[in-house]
Design a protein with these regions (language model features):
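Glycine- and charge-rich intrinsically disordered segments
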Residues: 1-18, 215-259
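Binding-interface segments
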Residues: 3-211
């Protein structure tokens, strides 16, 4: 049985389709077509548990965001045959802008010579160098900055070491990769730049920004494995790439306590 047929049959199950219609309404058929196509065309998702992949796609749909890794908003990454929900830096920016409370929002790398110190409240002072010289300089860290419509501004900066320490603390796969040097399932190994930008943006918004319900849901769901009970409509959530789910909860609590 082909992957497309398998997913198509799974989604056309009466109980599954009824649940989808209760959530998506008139968007149901388009959703089924898109997810079936994704499952058939993606080699890295072909062995993923169907329920977890569906739950990831539904999470993106609930936020009205495209579920496609090529667009950089929301997608799924396999972890031991389970689809884990991934959110890009673009999604955090998109959800923030929807609140109407953000005037500017950005995250980028910081090159050697650009970080010159901190001001009297501890915010980083960054002096950007010329674009034609910049690519020649090594990346020493990442920053994220925002300005709200009420005039509040905040910038945060993490060094490369601080970002790696964060990844090592919360990702089993990245720890294994650093220990063995072998290929890993974690995006921290294959897409460090994107993960660093997203991590800084996520930290900035969760600690200092204004968060809508969708933004809170996005932060909670990022890197999670989701499961749906079609009988009750309940959604369960786990964080398989953390050593324990308690570590993920600890990370979320740290964001609250530091805000």
């Amino acid at each position: 049985m082909s992957e497309q047929t398998s997913m198509s049959i799974y989604l056309s199950n009466e109980k599954t389709k009824k649940y989808l219609q209760s959530i998506l309404g008139e968007r149901t058929n388009q959703f089924i077509t898109s997810l079936t196509s994704l499952a058939s065309s993606s080699n890295y998702l072909k062995n993923c548990d169907r329920n977890s992949l569906l739950a990831c796609a539904l999470k993106a749909a609930s936020m009205y965001l495209p579920f496609d890794p090529n667009l950089g908003f929301a997608w799924a990454v396999p972890y031991k045959n389970t689809a884990t929900f991934q959110i890009g830096c673009k999604e955090y920016i998109q959800l923030a802008l929807r609140t109407g409370r953000y005037k500017a929002l950005n995250s980028r790398d910081v090159r050697e010579g650009e970080f010159v110190g901190r001001d009297f409240v501890g915010d980083p002072i960054i002096e950007w160098i010329l674009d034609d010289v910049r690519p020649e300089k090594p990346v020493i860290g990442y920053m994220a900055g925002m300005e709200l419509t009420n005039g509040f501004r905040k910038i945060i900066f993490w060094s490369i070491q601080e970002i790696e320490d964060h990844a090592l603390k919360y990702s089993q796969s990245f720890r294994k990769y650093k220990q063995t040097g072998k290929s890993s399932e974690t995006l921290w190994a294959s897409q460090f730049d994107k993960m660093a930008r997203k991590t800084l943006m996520k930290s900035l918004i969760s600690k200092f920004g204004i968060m809508s319900t969708d933004m809170q849901d996005a932060i909670k769901s990022d890197h999670s494995s989701l499961k749906i009970d079609f009988d009750t409509g309940d959604e369960s959530i786990e964080y398989p790439d953390n050593s324990t789910n308690l570590e993920k909860l600890s990370e979320m609590e740290e964001s609250k306590n530091e805000s």
